[in-house]
Each structure stands twice: as C-alpha cells, then as structure tokens.
C-alpha cells in the first residue's frame, strides 16, 4: 500500500510540474499576443490536426513562394520541439527565442522571410496581398494608411529596414 501511495504521489508531482511548466509559457505573453501566435499556428498547421509536422512546414513554405526547402532544414525545425509540436510547444519555442530578443530584430527577421535575395526590400504588391488576406487581415484603408508612412525605393519596393525603425522607434530618426 505504501509503495502504491508513493507511486501515486510521484505521478501527481510530475503532473503538477508539467502543468507548471506549460502554464509559465502562457504567462510570458499578453492575451493578444497569444491569440496572434494561435493564428500563426493555425496558418502553419495545414492539416488542422493540432500538430505541426513536416508536411505542414513544406506547405507553408510553398505558400510563401519557397518551394525547394531542404529536408534537413525541415527536420532541424521539427527537432527544436523535441517531440510533437502542438500549440503549447510552439508558444514555448517562440518564448525561448523572443526572451531577451530585440523586438527590432524580431521584426527584421520576419521581413527577411519575404526577401530571399537579401536586398532589404520586399515587393509592395505582394506584401499588400499578404496584409489583405493572411492572419489578422488589414482593410484596404489600413493598408493604404500604412503605405503612406512606408519608405519605398524608386521601384516601389518597401525598404523594410527603415520601416522596422519607424515601427520600433517612431516616425522621426534621432539626430
């Protein structure tokens, strides 16, 4: 009986520890941020099974225009989760990556996904289409308002490094 009780106590402690570990990740973010991560997770979880798998990642990259992603790269992403990547694991991975990360660097990193050539610009029309159709969809008026403040090159491409500065520091550069 005592050994049975000790076994039960161990399971309860392990369960509480797992709950504590998973609940901590939710305390790292505000509710609005968690909702945004949930929307991102839903966009990546193409087959809607609650787990991000290699096929989900491949399809997500394909939708972003990156068709030939090496298997090793996809495997490396999945291995970061050290098991199935459900929403809690997804949130934990982002929490670990963003904890101590400069918000400006996080924004630049997101823009770099749409800049495979590394030129520091993204195509205005493609970016507009993404804003109108993906995740937290912008209204056409919101897109036009954003583009009014967005630095562009002569070809009409968005200079995302300057835009990132405006987002993180405000409209005016310090002298």
UniProtKB/Swiss-Prot annotation:
Note: This chain binds calcium.
Top-level taxon in the UniProt lineage: Eukaryota
Protein's UniProt keywords contain Acetylation: yes
Coiled-coil zones: none
InterPro entries: EF-hand-dom_pair, EF_Hand_1_Ca_BS, EF_hand_dom, Myosin_RLC
Quaternary structure and interacting proteins, as annotated: Myosin is a hexamer of 2 heavy chains and 4 light chains.
Distribution of this protein across tissues and organs: Predominantly expressed in adult atrial muscle.
Swiss-Prot/TrEMBL keywords: Acetylation, Calcium, Metal-binding, Motor protein, Muscle protein, Myosin, Phosphoprotein, Repeat
Gene Ontology MF annotations: calcium ion binding
Gene Ontology BP term (one): cardiac muscle tissue development
SMART domains: EFh
Phosphoserine modification, residue list: 22-23
Residue span, EF-hand domain: 32-67, 102-137, 138-173
GO cellular component, one term: cytoplasm
Protein name: Myosin regulatory light chain 2, atrial isoform
Taxonomic classification: Eukaryota, Metazoa, Chordata, Craniata, Vertebrata
Keyword flag Cytoplasm: no
Residue numbers of N-acetylalanine PTMs: 2
Binding site for Ca(2+): 45, 47, 49, 56
Gene source species: Homo sapiens (Human)
